[in-house]
A protein has these predicted regions:
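N-terminal subdomain of nucleotide-sugar transferases
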Residues: 1-55, 60-65, 121, 255
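Conserved donor-binding/catalytic core segment of Leloir-type glycosyltransferases
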Residues: 7, 227-245, 251-254
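A short, active-site helix/loop in glycosyltransferases that binds the activated sugar's phosphate group
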Residues: 163-206
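Glycosyltransferase donor-sugar binding loop
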Residues: 238, 263-278
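Nucleotide-activated donor-binding/catalytic signature segment of Leloir-type glycosyltransferases, i.e.
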Residues: 276-298, 302
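Short alpha-helical segment that forms part of, or immediately flanks, the ligand-binding pocket
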Residues: 301, 324-329, 343-344
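Short hydrophobic beta-strand element within catalytic cores of glycosyltransferases
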Residues: 309, 333-336
Length: 410
C-alpha cells in the first residue's frame, strides 16, 4: 500500500529550531515518517541575506524533505499574517506535491493564506493551535502592561486599549478567524487551550486535544547526588528574564528565605538562537546562583538530573508547558502556577505544588520553604506513566490525520 503524503507547515524547522511549537512540529514529523509510514514534506522559512527574497532552498534533515522559503528581512504589519507572495509560492508547491492531507503549526510571517490555498486545492487540513496568535494581536494575551489580560470570551472593546491601531487589529482578527474556520480539524495541546477557542465560538466538533508529547529520559537516567552539602536543594528555572515567566517573583520569593542552603540554577535558553540574556542579569539570592548554558532535546537529561525542583511561576495562562512535563517525567518536583495548560498534569502535593497566579511572592516563598527539608534522592513521580510521550502523541496524531485524509467523520 502506498504511503500517504503529508505536507507540514511551520515557520521554523531544523536546523533553525526555535520555540516549543517547533520542537513539537519536528518531533511529530520524525515519528510520523518513521513509525506511521507517512511521506512527509515540510515547508518552512529562513532569513538568509545571501539569498534573494522568496528564494527556495531544498534540503534534508533527519531524513525529512524540507522546503525553506527565504522570507524578507522586514515585513509589513499585514504580511505577518496575510502574506500574498508567500501564498503564491505555496500554491505552486501544493500543486507540485499533491499532498493527501496537510498539518499546519505556527505560521507567523508565512501567513494564513496557506489555509486558503489548501482549501482551494481540496486538501484536508488540521491546524495545531499552539498559542493565541489567531485571536490576539500580541499572540499570548499579554497586555501592554506585560500582564495576562484574563479574557476568556474575547471582547474587542477590551482589545482596543491594548493595540496601537485598532482598525488594523480588527481587520487582522477578522481575517485570521475566517482563515482558521477553513480548517477541517483544530488540535490543541491542552484541554484549557481547547476550551478557550470553544468559548470564542470555534466549532466544538472540529476541536480536539492532542497533548504535546515529551521525550522520556534515556535508559539509565538518574539524578546526580549533591556533592556540596551546603547546596541541599537544587532549584531550576528555564524561563529567562522579565516578569511574565516569573523570574521577578522568584527573586522576591528567595529574598524572604533566611536559609542559604540551596542552589538556584538559571538556564540561558536564548543561547539556542545565538544570543544571551544573562550578562545583564541582576539576581541577588542568599544561596548559590548558577547560570548554565541552554540545553537541547538531546542534552536535557543532564540538566534535569542536576535539579530537584523546577520553578514555573508563569504569570500568564500558557497553552501547555513543555518544560513542566519534561521535569515531571524525570522525577523532578514542580512548583507551578495553577492555571492553564501547565497545571493539567500536576497533582498538587503529590508531584507538585500549585500556587495562585498572583504577583504576591508569599505563595512561592511558602512552596520553596516546604521543599527545603525533603529528601529528594528517593523521590519518584507516581503519575509519570500518564504523561504523553512523543511516541504516543504521534500515534494519536496519525489517527487524526488518517481520518482526515480518508475523509472519515471525526
Amino acid at each position: 500500500m502506498k504511503n500517504q503524503k503529508l505536507l507540514i507547515f511551520n515557520v521554523h524547522f531544523m536546523p533553525n529550531s526555535f520555540g516549543g511549537a517547533t520542537i513539537v512540529a519536528e518531533n511529530m514529523a520524525r515519528y510520523l515518517q518513521r513509525d506511521h509510514n507517512w511521506d512527509i514534506v515540510v515547508v518552512t522559512t529562513i532569513k538568509d541575506p545571501k539569498i534573494v527574497p522568496y528564494g527556495i532552498v531544498r534540503y534534508q534533515s533527519a531524513g525529512i524533505s524540507i522546503i525553506a522559503i527565504n522570507a524578507p528581512q522586514s515585513l509589513s504589519y499585514v504580511e505577518f499574517y496575510k502574506h500574498d507572495k508567500m501564498s503564491t509560492i505555496i500554491r505552486n508547491l501544493i500543486q507540485n506535491i499533491e499532498p493527501d492531507v496537510a498539518h499546519v503549526h505556527s505560521i507567523q510571517t508565512m501567513g494564513a493564506g496557506i489555509l486558503d490555498e489548501l482549501s482551494c486545492a481540496g486538501v484536508p487540513v488540521a491546524v495545531t493551535v499552539h498559542d493565541c496568535w489567531w485571536i490576539c494581536e500580541r499572540q499570548f494575551m499579554i497586555n501592554k502592561d506585560n500582564r495576562y489580560c484574563f479574557q476568556a470570551k474575547i471582547d474587542r472593546n477590551v482589545c482596543q486599549h491594548c493595540v496601537d491601531d485598532f482598525v488594523r487589529a480588527d481587520l487582522r482578527l477578522d481575517y485570521l478567524r475566517d482563515a482558521l474556520l477553513k480548517a477541517d480539524m483544530l488540535l490543541f495541546p491542552s484541554e484549557f487551550h481547547k476550551q478557550l477557542f470553544v468559548q470564542n465560538d470555534f466549532p466544538v466538533h472540529k476541536c480536539h486535544v492532542n497533548k504535546n508529547g515529551i521525550l522520556p529520559p534515556r535508559v539509565g537516567y538518574k539524578k546526580t547526588e549533591v556533592k556540596d552539602s551546603s547546596h541541599k536543594v537544587r532549584f531550576g528555572f528555564t524561563g529567562g528574564p522579565g516578569p511574565i515567566k516569573g523570574l521577578d517573583i522568584i527573586v522576591k520569593a528567595f529574598s524572604g528565605i533566611d536559609s542559604a542552603d540551596y542552589e538556584l540554577v538559571l538556564v540561558d535558553a536564548a543561547q539556542n538562537i545565538q544570543v544571551s540574556w544573562h550578562m545583564g542579569l541582576n539576581v541577588d539570592v542568599k544561596g548559590t546562583l548558577t547560570v548554565r548554558p541552554a540545553y537541547t532535546q538531546e542534552t536535557m537529561d543532564g540538566f534535569f538530573s542536576q535539579i530537584d525542583v523546577l520553578l514555573f511561576p508563569s504569570q500568564w495562562k500558557e497553552s501547555f508547558g513543555l518544560t513542566v512535563r519534561e521535569a515531571l517525567i524525570r522525577d523532578v518536583w514542580v512548583i507551578s502556577t495553577d492555571v492553564g495548560g501547565p497545571a493539567e498534569d500536576c497533582v498538587d502535593t503529590e508531584n507538585s505544588a500549585l500556587i495562585p497566579l498572583t504577583s504576591d511572592a508569599a505563595f512561592l516563598t511558602s512552596a520553596i520553604e516546604a521543599c527545603m527539608d525533603k529528601d529528594w534522592k528517593s523521590y519518584k513521580n507516581p503519575y509519570k506513566k500518564a504523561l504523553q510521550t512523543v511516541a504516543s502523541q504521534a500515534e494519536e496524531l496519525s489517527d487524526y490525520l488518517t481520518r482526515l485524509a480518508n475523509k472519515v467523520e471525526h
